[in-house]
Amino acid sequence: MQFMFKKRDNIKEVEEGKYLSPKFDENGLIPVITTDFQTGNLLMHGYMNYEALKKTIETKEVHYWSRSRKKLWRKGQISGFVQIVKEIRIDDDQDSVWLSVDIGNGASCHVGYRSCFYRSIPLGKIKNEEELEIGRASCRERV
């Protein structure tokens, strides 16, 4: 496989250099946080492999690696909820990606919510761990 990304030579180059040198984990994945370009709201968390990151950069449409299906997928391929990239950032260690995307009037979550984080976990004393009820988050908006 020919890499389009620079080899990670030293920490100074990774943290302060001008070249993309993403660090994929032992499974060949890098975590991705995706937010709404218009609102800044958190939409989802996913993973990319080398091919998904490359395709996302080249096409401006988000591609993820599905850990459950073990295959590359273009967001919206089945649901129609496409994510168009407005900006890509990488953290200081280059081991985590942040996507800022346009989802139009669509959803991000495959079950139809704008955000995959549509449920809220209550804070305070836990009475029964097996029956801790989760509530509706303030961002709960179904498309």
Show the residue positions of the predicted features.
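Short beta-strand segments
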Residues: 20-49
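Glycine-rich, flexible loop/turn motifs
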Residues: 15-20, 61, 68-69
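Residue-level detector of conserved catalytic or cofactor/ligand-binding positions
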Residues: 133-143
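Short, charged/polar surface micro-motifs in flexible loops or helix N-caps
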Residues: 37-39, 50-53, 94, 104-106
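Short, structured beta-strand-loop surface elements
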Residues: 62-122, 126-127
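A short, polar/charged loop-to-alpha-helix boundary motif
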Residues: 50-66
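Conserved active-site carboxylates
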Residues: 128, 132
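Short, basic/aromatic recognition patches
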Residues: 2-27
